[in-house]
From Swiss-Prot:
Changing I326T: Reduces interaction with Pto and fails to elicit Pto-dependent defense response in tomato leaves. This is Effector protein HopAB2. Residues 1-308 are annotated as: Host recognition. GO terms for biological process: effector-mediated suppression of host pattern-triggered immunity; symbiont-mediated perturbation of host programmed cell death. Residues 47-60 have a biased composition (Pro residues). Changing K546R: No effect in ubiquitination. Unlike many effector proteins, it is widely conserved among diverse genera of plant pathogens including Xanthomonas, Erwinia and many strains of Pseudomonas. Acts as a general eukaryotic PCD inhibitor in plants and yeast. Changing D331A: No effect in the interaction with Pto. Interacts physically with plant cell Pto. The lineage of its organism: Bacteria, Pseudomonadati, Pseudomonadota, Gammaproteobacteria, Pseudomonadales. Residues 242-255 have a biased composition (Polar residues). It comes from Pseudomonas syringae pv. tomato (strain ATCC BAA-871 / DC3000).
Length: 553
């Protein structure tokens, strides 16, 4: 037999060559014991090696394997390249001292005081985030939904918080209604991690559901023997998902990470909604109100009273608003910019403004007596306003006069007071009281920082003058009505969400978005309660210059 290994008495291995084929000269010179193409060629002994009669050291694993029976080409290549020698193996077995053992760890060099100072803020944020999660769980919020909405808020996408989530988030993120939630906020980052852990804990503690039986298929219904056959293997290749476990299938269920934005309200102030409140939802709500038989003039009066004087909306109109999906009240802590009643109010003013004045339904008004009976004791005739609703029992002269000014644009204070104050001697005091409530705000108009009309009409701000654009595209006042710099009865301003020093010009980063409005209507709104209509912070004549910007031609 060719290539049989034999061992002598001393335990040294030698090769017996029985191949009858002649060997090459190189093989004769080197004393190689095999020249077959099927066996590896043993390298010749170096010149400085001891003679062959000296006792040879025990062969290594490579030599023993090379002297074995005929090997394949892959085995020879692995033998020549991959198998380690004895020297390599001994080197690999030496213990090596790592650099980490030679040098102390960085954590060991830190002092306890420095570590405590560096980790204290993060521990505070973690504890705060955990308390928010506990509050959400105790209020029954959907933690998975909260986690998704928080992710959208940090990314600047649209969100749809529930009432519970919105109330809790406003407690811990007070600037959320105006500026959203920053992705760099440490509390937001820790809260996102706490919500992720809470979702995983809920998933782990949930009861295991039995997998839904899948419909029978040729691959799934075949017997065990056929599964092990060639046909069974082919069937599994054609339908690979049939053989997966239920856990694998459940883990690969697609998750919609971009929820649809239908009926979702942006957490940041939407400039498009601020420029034009008559959007599709408001128009659809108006159509629904008309189908219910609601008088649009009565609706406009109720909305103006609720927005400007914070008077409750009548029950019948409130019920109709609820039927079209609009909350008939504005919470004290809610921004007016984001409330659908403002959208409805703007759309309603646009719709009624398109109608001829002769076709408008009359507003509820005080019964008008004959002209002969309207003379005052001093011989003067009463001044009748175009819109003069009935006076409420709880309204004093100042409150009723401010409401008349709001309902009758262009009418002066004296004319409005003369319309409902019968005693001529009492009129000057009422006029002074109304001006005292309005003038401190309106008198600041000329002192405000300016924004040119060209800058206001840029794509960033998007102001559109009613004198230059179509009615459907013009900018409306936050409290209703089209805005135009050519209207002498209006003081067009842009009210910012953030205050800045009066020496600084407007900047998107510092002041955030602008809400365009008539400063006269803003003064009437602040006469009832001096608070910012968007942030609910204190807004009066002393600090309005830090928020407002005058739009100039």
């Amino acid at each position: 037999m060719a290539g049989i290994n034999r061992a002598g008495p001393s335990g040294a291995y030698f090769v017996g060559h029985t191949d009858p084929e002649p060997v090459s000269g190189q093989a004769h010179g080197s004393g190689s014991g095999a020249s077959s193409s099927n066996s590896p060629q043993v390298q010749p002994r170096p010149s400085n090696t001891p003679p062959s009669n000296a006792p040879a050291p025990p062969p290594t694993g490579r030599e023993r394997l090379s002297r074995s029976t005929a090997l394949s080409r892959q085995t020879r290549e692995w033998l020549e390249q991959g198998m380690p020698t004895a020297e390599d193996a001994s080197v690999r077995r030496r213990p090596q001292v790592t650099a980490d053992a030679a040098t102390p760890r960085a954590e060991a060099r830190r002092t306890p005081e420095a570590t405590a100072d560096a980790s204290a803020p993060r521990r505070g944020a973690v504890a705060h985030a955990n308390s928010i999660v506990q509050q959400l769980v105790s209020e029954g919020a959907d933690i998975s939904h909260t986690r998704n909405m928080l992710r959208n808020a940090m990314n600047g996408d649209a969100v749809a918080f529930s009432r519970v989530e919105q109330n809790i988030f406003r407690q811990h993120f007070p600037n959320m209604p105006m500026h959203g939630i920053s992705r760099d906020s440490e509390l937001a980052i820790e809260l996102r991690g706490a919500l992720r852990r809470a979702v995983h804990q809920q998933a782990a503690s949930a009861p295991v559901r039995s997998p839904t039986p899948t419909p029978a298929s040729p691959a799934a219904s075949s017997s065990g023997s056929s599964q092990r056959s060639l046909f069974g293997r082919f069937a599994r290749l054609m339908a690979p998902n049939q053989g997966r476990s239920s856990n694998t299938a459940a883990s690969q269920t697609p998750v919609d990470r971009s929820p649809p934005r239908v009926n979702q309200r942006p957490i940041r102030v939407d400039r498009a909604a601020m420029r034009n409140r008559g959007n599709d939802e408001a128009d659809a709500a108006l159509r629904g109100l008309v189908q219910q038989g609601v008088n649009l003039e009565h609706l406009r009066t109720a909305l103006e009273r609720h927005v400007m004087q914070r008077l409750p909306i009548p029950l019948d109109i409130g019920s109709a608003l609820q039927n079209v999906g609009i909350n008939p009240s504005i919470d004290l802590g809610e921004s007016l910019v984001q409330h659908p009643l403002l959208n409805l109010n703007v759309a309603l003013n646009r719709m009624l403004g398109l109608r001829p004045s002769a076709e408008r339904a009359p507003r509820p008004a005080v019964p008008v007596a004959p002209a002969t009976a309207s003379r005052r004791p001093d011989g003067t005739r009463a001044t009748r306003l175009r819109v003069m609703p009935e006076r409420e029992d709880y309204e004093n002269n100042v409150a009723y006069g401010v409401r008349l000014l709001n309902l009758n644009p262009g009418v002066g204070v004296r004319q409005a007071v003369a319309a409902f104050v019968t005693d001529r001697a009492e009129r000057p005091a009422v006029v002074a009281n109304i001006r005292a409530a309005l003038d401190p705000i309106a008198s600041q108009f000329s002192q405000l920082r300016t924004i040119s009309k060209a800058d206001a009409e840029s794509e960033e701000l998007g102001f559109k003058d009613a004198a230059d654009h179509h009615t459907d595209d013009v900018t409306h006042c936050l409290f209703g009505g089209e805005l135009s710099l050519s209207n002498p009865d209006q003081q067009v301003i842009g009210l910012a969400g953030n205050p800045t020093d009066t020496s600084q010009p407007y900047s998107q980063e510092g002041n955030k978005d602008l809400a365009f409005m008539d400063m006269k209507k803003l003064a009437q709104f602040l006469a009832g309660k001096p608070e910012h209509p968007m942030t609910r912070e204190t807004l009066n004549a002393e600090n309005i210059a830090k928020y407002a910007f005058r739009i100039v031609p």
